[in-house]
């Protein structure tokens, strides 16, 4: 199917899948291939037309007619198919009518050249419009993707900040609770230690008082014992002095007196 300006003008590309930018690459490539093929065919048909006109000029020159010089024409496929029968009939016409036919063909070829130029301009303009549209759509898509990426990044950062703040607040709360509990435990241990220390010191003080009392009793007993012993010994010495050195000493009496001394001290 030949390509027409209407086909180029009315062609529509589908939107790309999610995640792609611009039009669908396969469709764009296929369309460009089609344009390339049609333009190649147009050039080839142009060359055929040029060759046929040159052949017609040679026939006119060989027949002695006065025709127009060679004419180069450029036209689309539709125009070539329209004038091709006239070129064939011109070869079969009499020499007298060939000049008129060549002149008409030259005029028609000029119109075809103008039409080809207009078609080329229209194709160029359409391609530029499509290119601008594709570029604009690509920019819009890029801006949209960039905006979505920016929003996603901002949302991610905000969510991460919220989580970090929540974790920090939770950590601070736990730290305060643990610190308070540790302080309470330390206070309790200190209070218990102070209580036990007070109890121990009280018991030690009480025992010290008892020991000091007993020590004082022992000291008193020692003083009294020494005093009684001294008194007893003095009395014995005095008694011995009175009896004289000749009289025997009654050991039983002395032992009984010493026992009496001990009983008195006890």
Curated annotation (Swiss-Prot):
It is found in: Cytoplasm. Pfam families: DivIVA. InterPro entries: DivIVA_domain, DivIVA_fam. NCBIfam families: DivI1A_domain. Residues 31-64, 152-203 form a coiled coil. Phosphorylated by PknA. Residues 239-266 are annotated as: Disordered. Keywords: Cell cycle, Cell division, Cell shape, Coiled coil, Cytoplasm, Phosphoprotein. Forms homooligomers. This is Cell wall synthesis protein Wag31. GO terms for cellular component: cytoplasm. Important for maintaining cell shape and cell wall integrity by localizing peptidoglycan synthesis to the cell poles. The lineage of its organism: Bacteria, Bacillati, Actinomycetota, Actinomycetes, Mycobacteriales. Belongs to the DivIVA family. GO terms for biological process: cell division; regulation of cell shape. The modification Phosphothreonine is found at residue 77. It comes from the Bacteria. It comes from Mycobacterium leprae (strain TN).
